[in-house]
A protein has these predicted regions:
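Bacterial N-terminal signal peptides
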Residues: 18-27
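Extended carbohydrate-recognition surfaces in non-catalytic/accessory domains of CAZymes
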Residues: 31-124
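Regulatory cytosolic signal-relay segments
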Residues: 429-469
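First transmembrane helix
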Residues: 210-239, 338-358
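Aromatic-lined ligand-binding clefts that engage carbohydrates, nucleic acids, or primary amines
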Residues: 118-143, 181-183
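Interfacial "cap-and-anchor" motif at the non-cytosolic start of specific transmembrane alpha-helices
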Residues: 256-430
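An acidic-aromatic loop/edge-strand motif
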Residues: 161-223
Length: 469
């Protein structure tokens, strides 16, 4: 049995390494493909500010990717664009600080106008745009009519007000044969500006259903992680000698809060007045806090496989990052994101080493932990590349965390279940011992009674012999 268990662990470890290598290969391949060609096929990509979607089937949603007309450091309205000439055509989605106009490398901070002409089928469809987060403020016109905005667009940091609010924009009227889309964008806060995520176009029903499915999925994941957090807080309250549930509960809670600040930014639907700066600081702080909580949880699980020095180092680094996030200027905070991402990757590698060591030493529940860690590691690597603009896959950390949290919950539950089973076994042995002890006492009592009776008979016999003598 021991040999079979060792063989199974060896097989799972090999598959773990293979899965990790395959994940790396897929991510690197995606990165290379993203650099070599646009996300969409040529016939559905914009060329020099024109996108032909006249053959778009009903019910289908498409991305408005390709070459948009681009006016750097100019905020033009649709009327002003009639006489303006585009300085360049740029690839969307991409942060504008990745663009080079002539010999000028564009800065992170500034303003610009994007323009795209879209040819659509004249079949009576009501159109809608699915606009993701744009850093950090925008205004949208469609066919000369202002359709939506987020924050306040300005040509200086003093006049601009940032916001983080993705939304669905329903376009008025039916029967259009073309959509003239103009988007003003300004950014004076984030290290990346512009349209660095894809805007999607489709009929209103399809766009609405797509958004609702995303919101339901995100809300479900946030709810599950929140429930897991308070469940483990409850376990800690009942048994305070073991802090592992407290650490894991804190980790789940911070991840749930961060998940509400990314994607469709569900927290803005609850607190619409939350400022962009507070949102970004809170998001980064949740990342740092969750990293510390999970490392503390991991050290409690496998103290013999982890490093106490690394735990102390991580505490100091997380504290320094946390203070910097709360007190530093927002521009410096966002520009330091790369260092934060590198630190997260370094910590993730350390945690993987701890998990692998725990598996090789056949620690309890380490296999499930490694499986969850691999999924999370692949998701984090994808998101780091996505945030750097190297791939266009989307955010997967929340989903990876969902799988990972369930693996860790299984690990904790397994530990408590085994502790409970051991307690029951000990209780059963104690009951059996008490029962056997009582039986031994009864047997001893009967033996003593028999001895006493024998002694009484013996004394009587001796006394009778003495009298006769």
């Amino acid at each position: 049995m021991a040999q079979m268990s060792k063989y199974n662990q060896s097989i799972i470890l090999k598959w773990a390494y293979v899965t990790l290598l395959l994940s790396l290969q897929v991510l690197l391949t995606s990165c290379a493909v993203a650099r070599e060609r646009p996300l969409q096929e040529p016939h559905t990509s914009a060329v020099q500010g024109l996108l032909d979607l006249t053959a778009l089937p009903k019910g289908e949603i498409t991305k408005l990717d390709g070459e948009w007309a681009f006016y750097w450091n100019h905020l033009y309205t649709p009327g002003e664009l009639m006489t303006a000439r585009p300085r360049a055509y740029v690839s969307v989605p991409s942060a504008w600080n990745a663009y080079t106009l002539g010999e000028e490398k564009l800065a992170s901070y500034g303003s610009a106008t994007y323009e795209l002409q879209v040819l659509v089928p004249n079949d009576g469809r009501v159109w809608a745009l699915d606009v993701p987060v744009v850093f950090t403020a925008y205004r949208i016109w469609v066919n000369q009519v202002e359709a939506a905005s987020s924050g306040t667009v300005g040509q200086s940091a003093q006049s601009a007000v940032p916001a983080k609010y993705p939304q669905v924009v329903y376009l008025p009227g039916t029967g259009q044969t073309s959509l003239h889309i103009v988007i003003q964008v300004s950014n004076y806060e984030n290290y990346r500006g512009g349209l660095w995520q894809s805007i999607q176009l489709g009929d209103a029903t399809s766009i609405t259903v797509s958004q609702q499915f995303r919101i339901i999925g995100e809300a479900f994941l946030i709810g599950v992680m929140g429930i897991m957090a308070f469940y483990h807080f409850g376990i800690y309250i009942l048994r305070r000698k073991e802090p592992a549930p407290l650490y894991f509960g804190g980790y789940c809670l911070l991840i749930a809060l961060r998940s509400a600040m990314v994607g469709d930014v569900l927290i803005m639907r609850i607190y619409p007045g939350l400022s962009w700066e507070a949102l970004i600081r809170s998001e980064y702080f949740c990342v740092i806090g969750s990293l510390w909580f999970f490392n503390s949880f991991l050290y409690r699980l496998y103290p013999q496989d982890g490093s106490r020095r690394f735990k102390s180092l991580l505490t100091w680094v997380c504290s320094a990052f946390g203070l910097f996030i709360m007190a530093g200027s927002i521009q410096l905070v966002t520009e330091a994101l790369l260092f934060l991402q590198l630190f997260i990757l370094f910590t993730a590698l350390y945690m993987c080493a701890v998990f692998i060591r725990a598996v090789s030493r056949r620690r309890e529940g380490a296999l499930a932990a490694v499986a969850g860690a691999m999924v999370l590691g692949a998701a984090i690597m994808n998101d780091v590349l996505y945030l750097r603009g190297l791939v266009h896959t989307g955010n997967f950390t929340t989903l990876g965390l969902f799988v990972f949290i369930f693996a860790q919950s299984y690990l904790l539950s397994s530990g408590f279940a085994k502790a409970f089973s051991s307690s029951e076994e000990l209780a059963g042995k104690l009951i059996h011992l008490n029962a056997s002890l009582e039986e031994k006492v009864r047997q001893r009592t009967r033996a003593l009674e028999q001895v006493n009776k024998a002694n009484v008979i013996h004394r009587r016999f001796i006394g009778r012999n003495v009298i006769l003598a």
